[in-house]
């Protein structure tokens, strides 16, 4: 009987963990699943002399800044979240939609001002799933309804959809939503060493949060509700791989131990080999016996276009060869804690 009770308790616990990761959409707009043109907010585009407003530019991924490269069109600008259009506007055209948390969590940051970030007024919520921290981010809000330290449940109103931040007007009002991994608790030291401008947002600056493909996760969970964020990360396509000195802090491995491939060394390895998605999401970490003195590129996917255009400018070159750019090296140092 005791064994049965323990088994039942374990099943209940696992069910709770899985259900906690079944994400809700942040607004009443649920058209993602059947009419994406009604879900994503459009972007203004001027390409080849034609001005258009494609909704596709509001999706996650390399969906902006089209350019002709040979006979193909490549999109070089990466968009790290989902831009969700409003369903309700008042007589003046201002959106009225409430923005809710996509899952249970704790508010860790609520921007005090709308003028200190491209995100405008934004909120970050921490979710602890399977022993790992994930951070959802809600940007361009007209107003905030929560404060840091506040516990929230899925659907709890965080704020009102708006158009704060740079480059957005009333007609393009939307909430920009991300689901991120956290890179470094020493972010402020890294930022101070690399930028002359002040960091107004502490460790919850967008540069310290790297997004997973939230759009794909929503669609996948629709078919398979038990799919977790960790599953989604591990299923992401590899973009490039970097060797990093073994004395790198590798905080990502402490926060996301499921990134480790193979066994964890007893001490510091000679080096680490870290696999990233094309946009820089850490996908795997493996200890190596080959000593290196500084981060360098060991592999990059040949996407048939210059690497710069499909790696957010982190890798230069083309074909099967490439190397980290200055921006790429700076990013890898942050992601791996080698600074």
What kind of feature is each model-predicted range?
Residues 21-121, 163, 200-339:
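Surface-exposed, glycine-biased beta-strand/turn segments
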Residues 88-90, 131, 142-145, 183:
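Residues that cap or initiate secondary-structure elements
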Residues 94-96, 100-143, 170-172, 176:
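Zn2+-dependent peptidoglycan hydrolase active-site motif and core
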Residues 116-126, 150-224:
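Conserved, short, structured surface segments that act as functional micro-motifs
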